[in-house]
Amino acid sequence: MAEKLKVDLVTPYKKILSEEVDEITATGALGEFSVLPGHAPFLTSLKIGELTYKKSGQIVHLALNWGYFEVEDDKVTVLVETAERADEIDLERAKAALGRAEAALKKLSPEDKDYRVMEAALERALIRMQVAGKAARK
């Protein structure tokens, strides 16, 4: 069994991360899960949420959009629409996005075709703010 996990995190635009880590935690469609070296192979979808990894005692936080997470032979591949490290998130921009999403949702009914889009925007803004707050507390 390997002592580390090799993690590659990729968006359609660039590779965000390629590192060996001790542990990784993400938000799957069925809830939060963690992976340690020696984990059984699996593939799952990710929802908008937080990804954290631990490396040499340090914990790094990222905000993720929808995607996929695969584990095989101590190699983790994360494919997502977007990913931002906590210290890269513009908190004011996230707050503005939250305000826009809340305002749009007040004007829409759940049957409206844009309602779910705005719900996702709201969720994304909340996660970005939550993750950015973790960088601010360091």
UniProtKB/Swiss-Prot annotation:
GO term, biological process aspect, one: proton motive force-driven ATP synthesis
Matches recorded under SUPFAM superfamilies: Epsilon subunit of F1F0-ATP synthase N-terminal domain (SSF51344)
Annotated Gene Ontology cellular component terms: plasma membrane; proton-transporting ATP synthase complex
Keywords associated with the record: ATP synthesis, Cell inner membrane, Cell membrane, CF(1), Hydrogen ion transport, Ion transport, Membrane, Transport
Subcellular location: Cell inner membrane
Keyword Membrane set for record: yes
Membrane association type: Peripheral membrane protein
GO function term, MF aspect, one: proton-transporting ATP synthase activity, rotational mechanism
Family: Belongs to the ATPase epsilon chain family.
Record-linked NCBIfam families: ATP_synt_epsi, PRK13446.1
Subunit structure: F-type ATPases have 2 components, CF(1) - the catalytic core - and CF(0) - the membrane proton channel. CF(1) has five subunits: alpha(3), beta(3), gamma(1), delta(1), epsilon(1). CF(0) has three main subunits: a, b and c.
General function of this protein: Produces ATP from ADP in the presence of a proton gradient across the membrane.
Name this protein carries in UniProt: ATP synthase epsilon chain
